């Protein structure tokens, strides 16, 4: 099926180009999204008449997208989720979650603009946001079980490193506990030995009685 593009479509073509696409792709995506028209003679003529207006509108929306991209690109957003000790999420982080995280931080992002396969592990994840057919930005989702964990991940530590540190800290606390118990036992033994080898000396009254 031939369509005429009303805007740039990635891997397909630029505005005004007539391209061949699968009928299902045209009917289910390009046409309802307003990205193309069927390439009939009437539609091609109508496009040529409106071309200048469409190009002006495209230029305006591209400038707006570029301004947003300049602020959005490189931003990091925290998403709190429950997960196992190995870092596997109980559920997933989706395009909706990414859009909501950006929106809560003050950016206008629609889930349809987010290019993302569901995230199923803790960690930092780069996510593409298509703000305009010719403009995109990359954000980072910091998926963690707590804000504290997110801050550690942001410093460059992986979930494996965090788990290893927690395990080492737990082992250290256990060792300290055993050391304290051992030290207390040694003190008790010393006190017992001292009591056994150092009997009380006779008082002056006892010496007078013997005399």
UniProtKB/Swiss-Prot annotation:
**What is this protein's function?**
Binds to the 23S rRNA.
- The cysteines joined by S-S bonds are none
Keyword terms, alphabetized: Ribonucleoprotein, Ribosomal protein, RNA-binding, rRNA-binding
Q: Which GO terms describe its molecular function?
A: rRNA binding; structural constituent of ribosome
NCBIfam families from the UniProt entry: L9
What GO biological process term is on the record, naming one?
Answer: translation
Family in the record: Belongs to the bacterial ribosomal protein bL9 family.
Q: Where is this region: Disordered?
A: 183-211
Pfam families attached to this UniProt entry: Ribosomal_L9_C (PF03948), Ribosomal_L9_N (PF01281)
Biological classification of the source: Bacteria, Pseudomonadati, Pseudomonadota, Alphaproteobacteria, Rhodobacterales
Q: What is this protein called?
A: Large ribosomal subunit protein bL9
Which residues fall in a compositionally biased region of kind Acidic residues?
202-211
GO CC, sorted alphabetically, is: ribonucleoprotein complex; ribosome
């Amino acid at each position: 099926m031939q369509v005429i593009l009303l805007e740039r479509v990635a891997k397909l073509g630029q505005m005004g180009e007539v391209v061949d696409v699968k009928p299902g792709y045209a009917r289910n995506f390009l046409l309802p999204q307003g990205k193309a028209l069927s390439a009939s003679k009437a539609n091609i003529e109508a496009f040529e008449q409106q071309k200048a207006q469409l190009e002006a509108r495209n230029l305006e929306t591209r400038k707006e997208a570029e301004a947003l991209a300049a602020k959005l690109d490189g931003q990091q957003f925290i998403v709190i989720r429950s997960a196992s000790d190995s870092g596997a999420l109980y559920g997933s982080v989706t395009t909706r979650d990414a859009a909501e995280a950006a929106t809560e931080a003050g950016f206008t992002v629609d889930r349809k603009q987010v290019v993302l396969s569901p995230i199923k592990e803790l960690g930092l994840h780069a996510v593409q946001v298509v703000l305009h057919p010719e403009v995109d930005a990359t954000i980072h989702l910091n998926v963690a079980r707590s804000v504290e964990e997110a801050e550690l991940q942001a410093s460059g530590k992986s979930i494996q490193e965090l788990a290893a540190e927690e395990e080492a800290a737990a082992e250290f606390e256990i060792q300290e506990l055993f050391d304290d118990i051992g030290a207390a036992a040694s003190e008790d033994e010393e006190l017992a030995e001292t009591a056994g080898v150092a009997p009380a000396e006779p008082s002056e009254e006892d010496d007078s009685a013997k005399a």
